[in-house]
A protein has these predicted regions:
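Intrinsically disordered, low-complexity Ser/Thr/Pro/Gly-rich regulatory segments
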Residues: 1-228
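Short acidic, low-complexity intrinsically disordered linear motifs used
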Residues: 246-264
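Long, low-complexity intrinsically disordered regions
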Residues: 220-242
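Compositionally biased, charge-rich terminal segments
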Residues: 17-21, 241-248
Length: 264
């Protein structure tokens, strides 16, 4: 059984956190090289910056976005870190935001487990923790007909893509939110606030965004690999296995961590 303890919220300037990031970066250099960032990868990071700005214009964001905690398993404890894309705290209420840019609605499924872990850890500090995914839709099929056309195309995906509505129906933890005010009202479910690419362009300006995705779409589809169970940057034990680094167009937590820290 895995339990959590000793949570702390830190800024990215925390010395121990920076030391862990540097240690992880060195370890990564000894593994196979990561692929160069694709346009969609770059856009995902740019969309995150834009939506954090958008949030900051509407609510007061906390600068302490690094969550340090102890993960306890088999009578051993490991210090771990994860970055919160955005966080606001009002009294004893915390609201965590996860920003994802994806062309697959299945990205929501994969985010649920990580965000439930984050909520469990933060509840050791705050009794009520709301969680919201800000989903930037970069090409999720809009209808059953669109899915059928995609599967009948020259280069169909390896598995049928799900509709946004199908994922919301299949995953009870997810709740669609009409606006930001509605997103933070539930301390149990995970809110989903959806943005179009056009909305991100309106916030950031097209000249500041990587929007040339044609070359990305010409790349061969990569096989799926197991995903990390949580957004971990590093661990205090050399006995811990290193999670895999590659995934599809959704943000891989470890790779995203390095990009956000300016270390990749």
């Amino acid at each position: 059984m895995t339990t959590y303890g000793r949570p702390r919220l830190l800024t990215a300037a925390d010395k121990r956190y920076r030391a862990y990031i540097e240690q992880f970066t060195i370890a990564r250099k000894n593994q196979k090289a990561m692929r160069p960032p694709r346009q969609r990868d770059l856009f995902g990071g740019q969309a995150e910056v834009a939506l954090r700005q958008w949030l900051g214009e509407r609510i007061e964001l906390d600068e302490r976005r690094i969550l340090e905690y102890e993960e306890r398993r088999n009578r051993r404890g490991f210090i771990k870190y994860r970055e919160l894309d955005a966080l606001t705290i009002v009294g004893r209420h915390a609201h965590v935001f996860e920003i994802k840019a994806s062309r697959t609605a299945n990205a929501l499924r994969r985010a649920v487990g990580q965000l439930q872990e984050t909520r469990a850890i933060l509840r050791l500090l705050y009794p009520t923790v709301a969680v919201t995914i800000l989903l930037v839709d970069t090409g999720i099929p809009a209808s059953v007909e669109a899915v059928a056309a995609l599967m009948a195309g020259e280069r169909p995906p390896s598995r049928r893509p799900e509709l946004f509505s199908e994922v919301l129906t299949a995953v009870p933890a997810l709740r669609f939110a009409e606006d930001l005010a509605a997103a933070g009202t539930d301390g149990e479910a995970i809110g989903v606030l959806r943005f179009s690419v056009e909305a991100i362009i309106a916030i950031a300006g097209a000249e500041h965004l990587a929007l040339d995705w044609d070359a990305d779409d010409e790349e061969p589809e990569e096989p799926d690999e197991p995903r990390p169970t949580s957004s971990l940057y590093a661990t205090s034990s050399a006995d811990e296995p290193n999670p895999t680094a590659e995934d599809d167009d959704d943000d891989n937590p470890l790779a995203a961590a390095l990009r956000k820290a300016g270390l990749s």
